Amino acid sequence: SDLIAAEYGVSRIPVREALAQLQSEGLLEIAHYRGARVSRPRAGEIDELFDLRQLVEGDLLARALGRHDQRSLRELTRLQDALEDADDRLGWISGDIAFHEALYGPAERPRSLALFRQLRAPIDRFSAQALGPGARKQGWADEHRRLIATVAAGDAAAARTILEQHLQATRTIALAACSGDGES
């Protein structure tokens, strides 16, 4: 932390606080007197994160379902159109986060949305590595469009099923990226 503070001309305290925050979010492993490194979740951690995502996102979707209106549905469609136009991995991931936040936003559950973001962060690193052009992009786009349609129709059971399939496909990508990094 001393080197980072010196390089950026800031005191050590905010650097330590930032590193502690990254560590608490599971993004950084700190070995005292040895430094820090970016953490790599293991397959079991990925599975646990997705199990939790199923619970949190399923609940958010169910609570948001009856609260969407024409404006929010148009916004979901606009976000999905922009997402399909994204041509880089990081742009695609930020667009996907925006889509899901708009999908769940009408639930008006800020703590659940914060938990959704926290559960997603370690997964997105590995999805970003595995997501090449067209790798799964069309499948995700189709699932998003089907989610919009089922939300517009108020079909809770179909929306839940599509979300579960969507998260399972993403789990598969994240696990493949995790095992590709030599983690198990």
Show which residues each predicted segment covers.
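Residues at secondary-structure transition points
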Residues: 2, 13, 33, 40-47, ...
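Short linear motifs at protein or domain termini
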Residues: 1-66, 175-184
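Mobile beta-alpha loop/short-helix "lid" or hinge segments that flank ligand
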Residues: 24, 28-29, 119-121, 136-138
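C-terminal effector-binding regulatory domain of bacterial HTH transcription factors
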Residues: 156-184
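Conserved amphipathic alpha-helical segments that form helical-bundle/coiled-coil interaction surfaces
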Residues: 67-129, 142-150, 158-168
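Short amphipathic alpha-helical interaction/hinge segments
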Residues: 124-134, 171-178
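A generic membrane alpha-helix/interface feature
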Residues: 19, 118, 127, 138, ...
